[in-house]
Amino acid sequence: MLLIRNANIKTMAGPDLKNGCLLLENGKIAAVGQTVDAPEGVETLDAQGRLLTPGCVEAHCHIGLDNEGMRWEGMDYNEIVEPLTPQLRAIDSINPQDEAFGLALRGGVTTACTGPGSANVVGGTFAIVKLAGKRVDRMILRAPAAMKCAFGENPKGCYGHDKRQSPMTRMAVAALLRELLLRTLRYRDDKEAGKNPAFDMKLEAMLPVVNGEIPLKCHAHRADDILTAVRIAREFGLKLTLDHCTDGELIADELAKEQVPVFVGPSLGGKTKVELRNKSFTTAGTLYRAGLTVSIITDAPVIPLQYLPLAAGFGRSADGGGVARHHHQPGPQPRHRCACRQS
């Protein structure tokens, strides 16, 4: 057990506590309050007025799949061989010995949703993991957590521009995804009808998507790509998240009608491609005020994961603190969390 006292605590579930106490038991929070009951002789740490918060959660990154300080040797996040690879699983590439894990923990980030990049139209499944541990199997909170898909420049560039093959256009990106979804539905229907279709690893991986068990995790920057992702999800009755959502500020009213979770970022850094021309720290606040569930992301290693609190701070500052002010208002409120590499 560990008792932390005299801390300024951001509980994220109620009022802040000045000179409050927090009790840890077996690595988990057992109690928090202005005062807490603790056994006599418990190990005590005097925070001396320092800030104490829950661990930050990253909603989209590639930690463990794109290893710190490596070139091709540690780049295990994009299988740029064919544009549809739903059968790939993040947990088979995550390297817990990547030094980025320790750096993130020291920066206050304790949990991350990590997975494939956006070279492929469908890239494989993400996993939600704790960042402390030696073996990924014991770090998993949820796997599969989502199915990665990508719209816009990245799949067009990796295949159309670099390989001179489909998809060369946004039409082809959408068509490839639709075709995969239609094949999955037919495969599911045949299985349910007892027709015993030949085993297909790709379609098996897509079944949780069409069954509504996991969302499509949609990499989309440009406004039209964002709305194409929404259009396809609505056509097939799928859950989705909009990851990056760089142009979201331009279509906030339309996204508010759809009530789709948005993961905004990475907003630190330069505008390294055309899709990022409208990158802004104000996007998260605009979408939050429109009534959407918003998460600020690093897309690590685009922004190193330990700088997630910094990215969240910039987002709050650009919004004039409005996001934080909404947190303690009574009644139902949109949620905002600290929390996909553009790759």
Where are these regions (language model features)?
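His/Asp/Glu-enriched, well-ordered alpha-helical/loop segment
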Residues: E68-G69, M75-I80, T85, P215, ...
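Alpha-helical scaffold segments that flank or form the walls of functional sites
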Residues: W72-V122, S166-Y187, A193
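Divalent metal-dependent hydrolysis catalytic cores, especially in the metallo-beta-lactamase
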Residues: P83-R89, Q97-A132, L141-N154, E213-L216, ...
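Metal-coordinating catalytic core of metallo-dependent amide/deamination hydrolases
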Residues: I128-R231, E235, L268, P301
